[in-house]
Amino acid sequence: MNFTLKVLGTASALPTTERYPSAQVLDVRGRLFMIDCGEGAQMQLRRAGVSFLKIEHICLSHIHGDHLFGLFGLLSTMGVLGRSSDLNIYAPPSFRGVLDFFMANFGDGIKFGINLVELNMKEPERVYESRTAELLAFPMNHRIKTFGFIIREKMPPYNVHKEAISRYGLSLTEIGTLKRGEDVLRPGGTVIPNGEAAYIPYQPRSYAYCSDTAPFPELAEWIKGVDLLYHEATFPAEMFEMAVKTFHSTTLQAAQTARDAGVGRLLVGHYSSRFPSVDFYLDELKTVFPNTELAHDLDEFEIPLLKN
Protein backbone atom coordinates (compact mmCIF):
# COMPACT_ATOMS: atom_id res chain seq x y z
CA MET A 1 0.00 0.00 0.00
CA ASN A 2 2.96 2.31 -0.65
CA PHE A 3 2.61 5.93 -1.75
CA THR A 4 6.21 6.99 -2.37
CA LEU A 5 7.68 9.98 -4.19
CA LYS A 6 11.16 9.66 -5.70
CA VAL A 7 12.69 13.00 -6.68
CA LEU A 8 15.05 12.57 -9.62
CA GLY A 9 15.91 16.18 -10.38
CA THR A 10 15.64 19.54 -8.62
CA ALA A 11 17.37 21.97 -11.00
CA SER A 12 15.65 24.75 -12.88
CA ALA A 13 16.74 25.74 -16.40
CA LEU A 14 20.46 24.99 -15.90
CA PRO A 15 21.52 21.62 -14.48
CA THR A 16 24.49 21.51 -12.12
CA THR A 17 26.85 18.78 -10.97
CA GLU A 18 24.55 18.25 -7.98
CA ARG A 19 21.15 18.78 -9.57
CA TYR A 20 19.53 17.19 -12.60
CA PRO A 21 16.57 18.88 -14.34
CA SER A 22 13.00 18.29 -13.20
CA ALA A 23 11.80 14.69 -12.99
CA GLN A 24 9.94 12.66 -10.38
CA VAL A 25 8.29 9.27 -9.99
CA LEU A 26 5.31 8.65 -7.71
CA ASP A 27 4.70 5.02 -6.80
CA VAL A 28 1.04 4.48 -5.91
CA ARG A 29 0.68 0.88 -4.75
CA GLY A 30 3.09 -0.30 -7.43
CA ARG A 31 1.65 1.84 -10.24
CA LEU A 32 4.25 4.34 -11.42
CA PHE A 33 3.46 7.92 -12.45
CA MET A 34 6.41 9.90 -13.82
CA ILE A 35 6.09 13.68 -13.59
CA ASP A 36 8.30 15.63 -15.97
CA CYS A 37 11.30 14.04 -17.62
CA GLY A 38 14.27 16.37 -17.81
CA GLU A 39 17.64 15.58 -19.37
CA GLY A 40 19.40 12.70 -17.64
CA ALA A 41 16.21 11.15 -16.31
CA GLN A 42 17.30 7.67 -17.41
CA MET A 43 20.45 7.83 -15.29
CA GLN A 44 18.48 9.05 -12.29
CA LEU A 45 15.85 6.35 -12.75
CA ARG A 46 18.61 3.74 -12.61
CA ARG A 47 20.15 5.31 -9.52
CA ALA A 48 16.73 5.38 -7.87
CA GLY A 49 16.08 1.73 -8.71
CA VAL A 50 13.03 2.43 -10.87
CA SER A 51 12.18 0.00 -13.67
CA PHE A 52 11.69 1.79 -16.98
CA LEU A 53 9.13 -0.77 -18.06
CA LYS A 54 6.94 -0.33 -15.00
CA ILE A 55 6.27 3.34 -15.73
CA GLU A 56 2.65 3.51 -16.91
CA HIS A 57 2.05 7.26 -16.99
CA ILE A 58 4.21 10.28 -17.85
CA CYS A 59 2.88 13.74 -16.98
CA LEU A 60 4.57 16.66 -18.73
CA SER A 61 3.88 20.01 -17.11
CA HIS A 62 4.94 22.10 -20.09
CA ILE A 63 7.07 22.16 -23.21
CA HIS A 64 10.26 23.69 -21.86
CA GLY A 65 13.38 21.64 -22.41
CA ASP A 66 14.37 21.29 -18.77
CA HIS A 67 11.13 19.37 -18.20
CA LEU A 68 11.14 17.02 -21.19
CA PHE A 69 14.52 16.59 -22.92
CA GLY A 70 15.00 13.28 -21.15
CA LEU A 71 11.80 11.79 -22.54
CA PHE A 72 13.03 10.88 -26.00
CA GLY A 73 15.94 8.81 -24.80
CA LEU A 74 13.66 7.13 -22.29
CA LEU A 75 11.14 6.20 -24.99
CA SER A 76 13.94 4.79 -27.15
CA THR A 77 15.30 2.74 -24.26
CA MET A 78 11.84 1.38 -23.53
CA GLY A 79 11.76 0.22 -27.14
CA VAL A 80 15.19 -1.41 -26.88
CA LEU A 81 14.03 -3.23 -23.74
CA GLY A 82 11.09 -4.67 -25.65
CA ARG A 83 8.28 -2.80 -23.98
CA SER A 84 4.91 -4.01 -25.23
CA SER A 85 2.40 -2.37 -22.88
CA ASP A 86 0.91 1.01 -23.74
CA LEU A 87 2.34 4.19 -22.24
CA ASN A 88 0.07 7.11 -21.32
CA ILE A 89 1.47 10.63 -21.75
CA TYR A 90 -0.35 13.73 -20.51
CA ALA A 91 0.91 16.98 -22.03
CA PRO A 92 -0.10 20.37 -23.44
CA PRO A 93 -1.44 20.31 -27.03
CA SER A 94 1.82 21.61 -28.54
CA PHE A 95 3.55 18.37 -27.53
CA ARG A 96 1.73 16.41 -30.25
CA GLY A 97 3.88 17.90 -33.00
CA VAL A 98 7.05 17.20 -31.01
CA LEU A 99 6.03 13.58 -30.46
CA ASP A 100 5.05 13.12 -34.11
CA PHE A 101 8.46 14.42 -35.25
CA PHE A 102 10.28 12.12 -32.84
CA MET A 103 8.29 9.06 -33.87
CA ALA A 104 8.69 9.81 -37.59
CA ASN A 105 12.47 10.17 -37.34
CA PHE A 106 13.51 8.02 -34.38
CA GLY A 107 10.58 5.78 -33.57
CA ASP A 108 11.35 2.63 -35.60
CA GLY A 109 12.22 0.62 -32.50
CA ILE A 110 9.16 1.67 -30.55
CA LYS A 111 6.56 -1.08 -30.89
CA PHE A 112 4.39 -0.14 -27.92
CA GLY A 113 1.42 2.19 -28.08
CA ILE A 114 1.63 5.77 -26.85
CA ASN A 115 -1.67 7.25 -25.73
CA LEU A 116 -1.34 11.03 -25.74
CA VAL A 117 -3.88 12.92 -23.63
CA GLU A 118 -3.83 16.62 -24.51
CA LEU A 119 -4.23 19.01 -21.58
CA ASN A 120 -6.23 22.15 -22.26
CA MET A 121 -8.43 22.64 -19.20
CA LYS A 122 -9.10 25.86 -17.30
CA GLU A 123 -9.73 24.23 -13.91
CA PRO A 124 -8.94 20.86 -12.31
CA GLU A 125 -10.10 17.97 -14.47
CA ARG A 126 -9.67 14.23 -14.08
CA VAL A 127 -7.63 12.78 -16.93
CA TYR A 128 -7.17 9.23 -15.64
CA GLU A 129 -8.72 6.94 -13.08
CA SER A 130 -8.37 3.36 -11.98
CA ARG A 131 -10.18 1.41 -9.30
CA THR A 132 -7.93 2.85 -6.60
CA ALA A 133 -6.45 6.15 -7.85
CA GLU A 134 -7.03 9.15 -10.07
CA LEU A 135 -4.96 11.81 -11.82
CA LEU A 136 -6.13 15.41 -12.17
CA ALA A 137 -4.55 18.20 -14.20
CA PHE A 138 -5.03 21.95 -13.83
CA PRO A 139 -3.51 25.11 -15.36
CA MET A 140 -0.50 26.92 -13.92
CA ASN A 141 0.54 30.56 -14.36
CA HIS A 142 3.71 30.41 -16.45
CA ARG A 143 5.06 31.98 -19.63
CA ILE A 144 3.63 29.19 -21.78
CA LYS A 145 0.74 26.78 -21.32
CA THR A 146 1.64 24.80 -18.21
CA PHE A 147 -0.19 22.32 -15.98
CA GLY A 148 0.04 21.01 -12.46
CA PHE A 149 -1.08 17.60 -11.30
CA ILE A 150 -2.81 15.93 -8.38
CA ILE A 151 -2.51 12.19 -7.89
CA ARG A 152 -4.71 10.79 -5.17
CA GLU A 153 -6.19 7.59 -3.90
CA LYS A 154 -9.91 7.07 -4.20
CA MET A 155 -12.06 6.70 -1.13
CA PRO A 156 -11.95 3.02 -0.11
CA PRO A 157 -15.11 0.98 0.54
CA TYR A 158 -16.37 1.26 4.09
CA ASN A 159 -15.65 -1.50 6.58
CA VAL A 160 -18.54 -2.74 8.70
CA HIS A 161 -18.01 -3.15 12.44
CA LYS A 162 -18.19 -6.83 13.39
CA GLU A 163 -20.16 -5.87 16.47
CA ALA A 164 -22.78 -4.15 14.27
CA ILE A 165 -23.18 -7.28 12.13
CA SER A 166 -24.14 -9.36 15.15
CA ARG A 167 -26.10 -6.64 16.95
CA TYR A 168 -28.33 -5.86 13.98
CA GLY A 169 -28.22 -9.30 12.37
CA LEU A 170 -27.12 -7.71 9.12
CA SER A 171 -27.75 -9.55 5.87
CA LEU A 172 -25.18 -9.67 3.05
CA THR A 173 -27.27 -7.15 1.13
CA GLU A 174 -27.32 -4.78 4.10
CA ILE A 175 -23.57 -5.17 4.59
CA GLY A 176 -23.09 -4.25 0.93
CA THR A 177 -25.23 -1.15 1.43
CA LEU A 178 -23.14 -0.05 4.39
CA LYS A 179 -19.86 -0.68 2.52
CA ARG A 180 -21.08 1.75 -0.17
CA GLY A 181 -21.39 4.42 2.51
CA GLU A 182 -25.20 4.35 2.64
CA ASP A 183 -27.63 3.95 5.52
CA VAL A 184 -29.68 0.76 5.76
CA LEU A 185 -33.45 1.25 5.60
CA ARG A 186 -35.41 -1.77 6.74
CA PRO A 187 -39.07 -2.57 6.10
CA GLY A 188 -41.13 -0.79 8.70
CA GLY A 189 -38.88 2.28 8.65
CA THR A 190 -35.99 1.19 10.88
CA VAL A 191 -32.77 2.97 9.89
CA ILE A 192 -29.27 1.70 10.63
CA PRO A 193 -27.01 4.77 10.23
CA ASN A 194 -23.87 4.20 8.24
CA GLY A 195 -21.86 6.30 10.66
CA GLU A 196 -22.82 3.97 13.49
CA ALA A 197 -22.29 0.62 11.78
CA ALA A 198 -19.40 1.28 9.35
CA TYR A 199 -16.14 3.22 9.07
CA ILE A 200 -13.56 4.27 6.50
CA PRO A 201 -10.57 1.92 6.97
CA TYR A 202 -7.92 4.51 6.05
CA GLN A 203 -7.58 8.06 4.80
CA PRO A 204 -6.90 8.36 1.04
CA ARG A 205 -3.50 9.91 0.32
CA SER A 206 -2.79 12.73 -2.13
CA TYR A 207 0.11 14.48 -3.83
CA ALA A 208 0.19 17.74 -5.83
CA TYR A 209 2.90 18.92 -8.23
CA CYS A 210 3.04 22.64 -9.05
CA SER A 211 5.88 23.66 -11.37
CA ASP A 212 6.50 25.96 -13.15
CA THR A 213 4.25 28.76 -11.92
CA ALA A 214 3.88 32.21 -10.49
CA PRO A 215 1.29 32.51 -7.71
CA PHE A 216 -2.38 32.89 -8.63
CA PRO A 217 -5.52 33.08 -6.48
CA GLU A 218 -7.22 29.81 -7.44
CA LEU A 219 -4.29 27.51 -6.78
CA ALA A 220 -4.69 27.14 -3.02
CA GLU A 221 -8.30 26.06 -3.42
CA TRP A 222 -7.48 23.57 -6.18
CA ILE A 223 -4.87 21.75 -4.10
CA LYS A 224 -6.60 22.20 -0.75
CA GLY A 225 -5.67 19.67 1.90
CA VAL A 226 -3.28 17.47 -0.08
CA ASP A 227 -0.93 15.42 2.07
CA LEU A 228 2.22 16.45 0.20
CA LEU A 229 2.70 19.46 -2.06
CA TYR A 230 5.72 19.89 -4.33
CA HIS A 231 5.93 23.56 -5.31
CA GLU A 232 8.69 25.21 -7.26
CA ALA A 233 10.77 27.77 -5.35
CA THR A 234 13.15 28.91 -8.04
CA PHE A 235 14.21 32.07 -6.23
CA PRO A 236 14.77 33.29 -2.67
CA ALA A 237 12.52 36.04 -1.34
CA GLU A 238 14.98 38.81 -2.24
CA MET A 239 14.64 37.94 -5.96
CA PHE A 240 10.92 38.71 -6.06
CA GLU A 241 11.21 40.94 -9.14
CA MET A 242 13.02 38.22 -11.09
CA ALA A 243 10.31 35.75 -10.12
CA VAL A 244 7.63 38.11 -11.42
CA LYS A 245 9.54 38.69 -14.67
CA THR A 246 10.02 34.97 -15.37
CA PHE A 247 6.66 33.71 -14.01
CA HIS A 248 8.27 31.66 -11.26
CA SER A 249 7.83 31.59 -7.48
CA THR A 250 9.94 32.65 -4.53
CA THR A 251 10.35 30.70 -1.31
CA LEU A 252 7.82 32.87 0.50
CA GLN A 253 5.26 32.55 -2.29
CA ALA A 254 5.52 28.76 -2.30
CA ALA A 255 5.12 28.70 1.49
CA GLN A 256 2.14 31.06 1.36
CA THR A 257 0.40 28.79 -1.14
CA ALA A 258 1.02 25.78 1.11
CA ARG A 259 -0.31 27.66 4.13
CA ASP A 260 -3.41 28.92 2.31
CA ALA A 261 -4.12 25.44 0.94
CA GLY A 262 -3.77 23.78 4.33
CA VAL A 263 -1.52 21.03 2.98
CA GLY A 264 0.14 18.46 5.20
CA ARG A 265 3.74 18.96 4.06
CA LEU A 266 5.50 21.26 1.62
CA LEU A 267 8.40 20.11 -0.53
CA VAL A 268 10.22 22.61 -2.73
CA GLY A 269 12.64 22.34 -5.64
CA HIS A 270 13.43 23.75 -9.12
CA TYR A 271 16.29 25.77 -7.65
CA SER A 272 18.12 28.51 -9.50
CA SER A 273 21.64 27.49 -10.51
CA ARG A 274 22.88 30.77 -9.02
CA PHE A 275 23.01 29.06 -5.64
CA PRO A 276 25.29 26.03 -5.12
CA SER A 277 23.55 25.56 -1.78
CA VAL A 278 19.93 26.43 -1.06
CA ASP A 279 20.00 25.59 2.64
CA PHE A 280 19.17 29.21 3.41
CA TYR A 281 15.87 28.76 1.55
CA LEU A 282 14.59 26.67 4.43
CA ASP A 283 14.72 29.52 6.95
CA GLU A 284 12.62 31.70 4.64
CA LEU A 285 10.12 28.92 3.96
CA LYS A 286 9.63 27.96 7.59
CA THR A 287 8.78 31.50 8.65
CA VAL A 288 5.51 31.00 6.74
CA PHE A 289 5.01 27.22 6.66
CA PRO A 290 7.02 25.30 9.26
CA ASN A 291 6.38 21.80 7.89
CA THR A 292 8.60 22.36 4.86
CA GLU A 293 11.47 20.33 3.40
CA LEU A 294 14.00 20.99 0.66
CA ALA A 295 14.03 18.36 -2.07
CA HIS A 296 17.40 17.00 -3.18
CA ASP A 297 18.12 14.70 -6.10
CA LEU A 298 17.31 11.05 -5.29
CA ASP A 299 15.41 11.90 -2.11
CA GLU A 300 12.41 9.71 -1.28
CA PHE A 301 9.29 10.82 0.55
CA GLU A 302 6.68 8.40 1.83
CA ILE A 303 3.11 9.38 2.60
CA PRO A 304 2.16 6.90 5.31
CA LEU A 305 -1.15 5.07 5.37
CA LEU A 306 -3.22 6.30 8.31
CA LYS A 307 -5.69 3.67 9.42
CA ASN A 308 -8.88 4.63 11.22
Residue ranges and their predicted role:
Residues 35-38, 55-63, 92, 207-213, ...:
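Active-site neighborhood of phospho(di)ester-bond hydrolases with catalytic His/Asp-centered motifs
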Residues 87, 276-299:
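Short acidic, glycine/proline-enriched helix-loop-strand junctions
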Residues 1-48, 84-86, 149-151, 199-210, ...:
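Conserved beta-strand hairpin/beta-sheet module of binuclear metal-dependent hydrolase folds
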Residues 39-90, 118-120:
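Active-site metal-binding motif and surrounding structural segment of the metallo-beta-lactamase
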Residues 120-268, 279-283, 288, 304-308:
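Metal-dependent phosphodiesterase/nuclease catalytic metal-binding core
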Residues 71-77, 102, 276-286:
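Metal-dependent catalytic neighborhoods of phosphoester/phosphodiester hydrolases
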Residues 6, 90, 115-120, 136-138, ...:
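General small-molecule cofactor/ligand-binding pocket signal
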Residues 83-87, 92-120:
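Active-site neighborhood of divalent metal-dependent phosphoester bond hydrolases
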